[in-house]
UniProtKB/Swiss-Prot annotation:
GO molecular function: beta-2-microglobulin binding; IgG binding; IgG receptor activity
Species name: Rattus norvegicus (Rat)
Pfam families hit by this protein: C1-set, MHC_I
Tissues expressing this chain: Intestinal epithelium.
Name this protein carries in UniProt: IgG receptor FcRn large subunit p51
Segments traversing the membrane: 299-322
Self-association and partners: FcRn complex consists of two subunits: p51, and p14 which is equivalent to beta-2-microglobulin. It forms an MHC class I-like heterodimer. Interacts with albumin/ALB; this interaction regulates ALB homeostasis.
Keyword annotations of the record: Cell membrane, Disulfide bond, Endosome, Glycoprotein, IgG-binding protein, Immunoglobulin domain, Membrane, Phosphoprotein, Receptor, Signal, Transmembrane, Transmembrane helix
InterPro entries: Ig-like_dom, Ig-like_dom_sf, Ig-like_fold, Ig/MHC_CS, Ig_C1-set, MHC_class-I_related, MHC_I-like_Ag-recog, MHC_I-like_Ag-recog_sf
Function: Cell surface receptor that transfers passive humoral immunity from the mother to the newborn. Binds to the Fc region of monomeric immunoglobulin gamma and mediates its selective uptake from milk. IgG in the milk is bound at the apical surface of the intestinal epithelium. The resultant FcRn-IgG complexes are transcytosed across the intestinal epithelium and IgG is released from FcRn into blood or tissue fluids. Throughout life, contributes to effective humoral immunity by recycling IgG and extending its half-life in the circulation.
Family per record: Belongs to the immunoglobulin superfamily.
Glycosylation: residue positions: 109, 126, 150, 247
Entry keyword Transmembrane: yes
């Protein structure tokens, strides 16, 4: 059988493209998909995030029904139909995942979390190295081979889901086409049109607050909002002198940026002697904030916080997923049990005094 015209064009592009990526780490393009049967957690029934390496560039859920860019990728000079195509493809995957969840519920008692990690990276010759693995309730149970068009695995549930999807018209062909053709096309497109986004730098805005602690102490919370890249260094100052970095944590926002906070226990009544300072790639010099005095970087902090209320500021699995993607683990499976369920909610473990209020993690409309 002859190769289709799009396939010929892609092959020529992969051959003719200068080998400029060879000297640098090759970024994978990955989609993390998840569907749940138990909606009591307040999560959507289906959601997806798209990643270029450890940088999130896309979000989608069944409530909004549109694929949206994240972070600096909002300004990527994409072709006009690109996000419509992403939306169409993710709606198809949403249908497959939700049908699988319903079928599992009908045949097996229990609740289910079905996840997929689909994507590709470019081999040294710029051909596609596809990934298509699936997990059920936090454990890998199935793989898809795009060259044979088969879903396979050792679990009984593999037969249930795999046979269901094999019966769907064109499902295997579309999945193979996505992994071998569409995915490398998109990855090349992002590298060509949005290469500068990989060097995106967004400076943080900050605030420092205090709350009562135990045994006559106070707890200072230094929070940094809406910054990228995620590496950020905290420092507490007492009367202008370094007084430690506190206990620090970092997590992703749903818009591709990050938030972080650090906690320091001090003597009650001593709070106003302290300042908080951060160092970040997006800042020309360290940014320092006094207690209860919002600092300004390149954008007023009020605008940053208000903006957080208007965008999707938390993606399901955000904290745990980002940490696993960044650490290079093979699959960011979430079990939706124990502590994992907390990582699926807005803002991770951001302290209440540092978190913008009134945020809906999955708004149905923009």
């Amino acid at each position: 059988m002859g190769m289709s015209q799009p396939g010929v064009l892609l092959s020529l592009l992969l051959v003719l493209l200068p080998q400029t990526w060879g000297a640098e780490p090759r970024l994978p393009l990955m989609y993390h998909l998840a569907a749940v049967s138990d909606l009591s957690t307040g999560l959507p029934s289906f959601w997806a995030t798209g990643w270029l390496g450890a940088q999130q560039y896309l979000t989608y859920n069944n409530l909004r029904q549109e694929a949206d860019p994240c972070g600096a990728w909002i300004w990527e000079n994409q072709v006009s139909w690109y996000w419509e195509k992403e939306t169409t493809d993710l709606k198809s995957k949403e249908q497959l995942f939700l049908e699988a969840i319903r079928t599992l519920e009908n045949q097996i008692n229990g609740t289910f979390t079905l996840q997929g990690l689909l994507g590709c990276e470019l081999a040294p010759d710029n051909s596609s190295l596809p990934t298509a693995v699936f997990a059920l309730n936090g454990e890998e149970f199935m793989r898809f081979n795009p060259r044979t068009g088969n879903w396979s695995g050792e679990w009984p549930e593999t037969d249930i889901v795999g046979n269901l999807w094999m019966k769907q018209p064109e499902a295997a062909r579309k999945e193979s086409e996505f992994l071998l053709t569409s995915c490398p096309e998109r990855l090349l497109g992002h590298l060509e049109r949005g290469r500068q986004n990989l060097e995106w730098k967004e400076p943080p805005s900050m605030r420092l607050k205090a709350r009562p602690g135990n045994s006559g102490s106070s707890v200072l919370t230094c929070a940094a909002f809406s910054f990228y890249p995620p590496e950020l260094k905290f420092r507490f100052l007492r009367n202008g002198l370094a007084s430690g970095s506190g206990n620090c944590s970092t997590g992703p926002n749903g818009d591709g940026s990050f938030h972080a906070w650090s906690l320091l226990e001090v003597k009650r009544g001593d709070e106003h002697h302290y300042q908080c300072q951060v160092e970040h790639e997006g800042l020309a010099q360290p940014l320092t904030v006094d207690l209860d005095s919002p600092a300004r970087s390149s954008v007023p902090v009020v605008g940053i916080i208000l903006g957080l209320l208007l965008v999707v500021v938390a993606i399901a699995g955000g904290v745990l997923l980002w940490n696993r993607m960044r650490s290079g683990l093979p699959a960011p499976w979430l079990s939706l049990s124990g502590d994992d369920s907390g990582d699926l909610l807005p803002g991770g473990n951001l302290p209440p005094e540092a978190e913008p209020q009134g945020v809906n993690a999955f708004p149905a409309t923009s």
